[in-house]
């Protein structure tokens, strides 16, 4: 299964995976508007991969089949307060 990956010019570390390069027909218009003009990053063969950097391969495959796209967002930033409190308790 091949997919095309695009990065968002508006949101750092946000990527959109779609089934076919330049075919955004299954991506909601609202998502595309908030994502910005997609910037092509790469084509990726998902069948040849067991892992991805920050996304679960099976979740990506299922999302592509069921809804035609997968949106990868960055993990939430760690709370500096929680980190500080954790260090002071140790």
From Swiss-Prot:
YcgL domain residues: 1-85
Domain of life: Bacteria
Transmembrane segments: none
Cystine connections: none
PROSITE patterns associated with the record: YCGL
UniProt cross-references to Pfam families, sorted A to Z: YcgL (PF05166)
Xref: InterPro entries: YcgL-like_sf, YcgL_dom
Protein name (record): YcgL domain-containing protein YPO2080/y2231/YP_1923
Naturally occurring in which organism (per UniProt): Yersinia pestis
Native organism taxonomy: Bacteria, Pseudomonadati, Pseudomonadota, Gammaproteobacteria, Enterobacterales
